[in-house]
Amino acid sequence: MARQTPIERYRNIGISAHIDAGKTTTTERILYYTGVNHKIGEVHDGAATMDWMEQEQERGITITSAATTCFWKGMDRSLPEHRFNIIDTPGHVDFTIEVERSMRVLDGACMVYCAVGGVQPQSETVWRQANKYKVPRLAFVNKMDRTGANFFKVVDQMKTRLRANPVPVVVPIGAEDSFTGVVDLLKMKAIIWDEASQGMKFSYEDIPAGLEGVAQEWREKMVEAAAEASEELMNKYLETGDLTEDEIKLALRTRTIACEIQPMLCGTAFKNKGVQRMLDAVIDYLPSPVDIPPVTGTDDDDQPISRRADDKEKFSALAFKLMTDPFVGQLTFVRVYSGVLQSGSSVYNPIRGKKERIGRILQMHANQREEIKEILAGDIAACVGLKEVTTGETLCDIDSPITLVKMIFPEPVISQAVEPKTKADQEKMGIALGRLAAEDPSFRVRTDEESGQTIISGMGELHLEIIVDRMKREFGVEANVGKPQVAYRETIRDLVKDVEGKFVRQSGGKGQYGHVVLTVEPQEPGAGFQFVDAIKGGVVPREFIPAVEKGLIDTLPNGVLAGFPVVDVKVTLTFGSYHEVDSNENAFKMAASMGFKDGMRKAKPVILEPMMAVEVETPEDYAGTVMGDLSSRRGMVQGMDDMVGGGKVIKAEVPLSEMFGYSTSLRSATQGRATYTMEFKHYSEAPKNVADAIITARGK
């Protein structure tokens, strides 16, 4: 089957924003203008097409990033048809994993900001993720019709909070109730959208009186930013004082793709203004798969190789999301980087060393689907029939393997015990949790060996709440959940030398003998565990060294204070002895474990607790109450900023253990007028009284 859209006209983009910036509404409008939706879905009434899980429609927030394909010929329908693959990403901080996954497979992103709220904490997280994957992006300032809307304030916030380099290519005509359209700074014309056609039609008009000065000032800034793309353009700009529309577009495109600038637009998705111009900007400034560097990976010998975005190259793709679909079973969303894949053919998974057959290939549109015969370089689609692929793994041609860079996922910070309401559901719950864990790498399931309880762990209270909710809705398993438990860690503060571990058993016949001498010392936070073999002269034979390391690693999950996992410790094997007959791997494993535990006890062990970055937005009247409450939760208030339109933003670092049920108490303290966001920051040593309480509670 021939390619219907040349790859140069593909745009794989994400739409990303803080909660309530109007991202789902923006996506809905895109689907409407590109002709996919004939009735606009509103988030307010729970009918938005992209939010297709029941919980999302109830909560009015987007949880899973649905992938949608649509087509655009430009606002005035004068361009050749471009194909947009849009990934809708969640804005809630408990779902940053979804954002991270989608960033990995996007070529460009559109950041949506609220004209009133501006750049919020979650926006900063998303921005950092986009920087990490070097994703070119545009900014769209939404909700220009709201009271307190201020486009230029958001421009400033992008510079100060995100250290971004925004370049407005439009400026608003009016704001709040009087927002009527935008001035296109390239054409120096006003764009006014026709309300009767829900913004499908528009007209170019003269710039309203009184706006020419502002438009001229921002046009000069835009042309200057374009001129910096090359020496040649800069010279022309210095000589003539201007550049042509095509020169500006091309120069801004070059600099956007290089992540040097971010073109900026504005509008109100809800009132059908501005999204159309943003779609044109996606074509003008964001890259196609061939505009970005070839994807890199490693071959079977761990040598670096790359693949160009070309149908003639060997097939390579990344599985970036798994979903369980009630009708077809497991869907594996893939981004194809090179080559072509037909339904019914086989692919190779180099990470598992396994070959798998693709059953069907589905082109997704939110929650509707269309079966297609093949996918080509640059495509994003869902495959049915893959049994053993998990998120972040590569699929490639059997004859020329490539392993694309694996994604790194954060460790969960909160755990809860969960049990089915009826014993009969035990097995069903196991299957349900297994499926949900396969879909979401930031969610873990394990069985507590001592209590036999099933423990689920995730990125926050809302994350686990939604998992339990999905278990009930999708798998029919009702569960009771225990009190949330914090993921504490243990580490040490002192260096201890010459710690001995000796395991000797003599019970007639062959005995056991292992003897090690260790140095145990703390490492930098986040450095993890390190083992160093410093044995000289074979006092511990070579073949037993791996057993020593294994003994140490097996001891890490259970610390000496309260049985929490041990982190950031370095252990050096310095000396030891062995017995010709009685020494074996098991004896050295036991000796290493005993020595390590003894070393931990002597090296000033401490408990570490997860600290959260908390931001509370509150009316000024309650600022004192909120700060007092955060301090009473052992929080360190780090600053307070003014919010536009009144109110304060309070930033603090608070232990996670003190934040349970915070949303309820914040609501009652501020009569429901304050909101907060929270995300994991780092681990920090728990004060002695807190550590003692944790140890006592664990000992019961």
From Swiss-Prot:
Main localization category: cytoplasm
GO terms for MF: GTP binding; GTPase activity; guanosine tetraphosphate binding; translation elongation factor activity
Binding positions (GTP): 17-24, 88-92, 142-145
Ranges where the tr-type G domain occurs: 8-290
Subcellular localization, as worded in the UniProt entry: Cytoplasm
Domain of life: Bacteria
UniProt-listed InterPro entries: EFG_II, EFG_III, EFG_III/V, EFG_IV, EFG_V, EFG_V-like, EFTu-like_2, G_TR_CS
GO CC entries: cytoplasm
One GO term (biological process): ribosome disassembly
Assigned keywords, A-Z: Cytoplasm, Elongation factor, GTP-binding, Nucleotide-binding, Protein biosynthesis
Signal peptide: none
One Pfam family here: GTP_EFTU
Function text: Catalyzes the GTP-dependent ribosomal translocation step during translation elongation. During this step, the ribosome changes from the pre-translocational (PRE) to the post-translocational (POST) state as the newly formed A-site-bound peptidyl-tRNA and P-site-bound deacylated tRNA move to the P and E sites, respectively. Catalyzes the coordinated movement of the two tRNA molecules, the mRNA and conformational changes in the ribosome.
Alphabetical list of HAMAP family matching this protein: EF_G_EF_2_B (MF_00054_B)
Entry similarity comment: Belongs to the TRAFAC class translation factor GTPase superfamily. Classic translation factor GTPase family. EF-G/EF-2 subfamily.
Protein name: Elongation factor G
Organism: Leptothrix cholodnii (strain ATCC 51168 / LMG 8142 / SP-6) (Leptothrix discophora (strain SP-6))
Name of the gene encoding the protein in the UniProt record: fusA
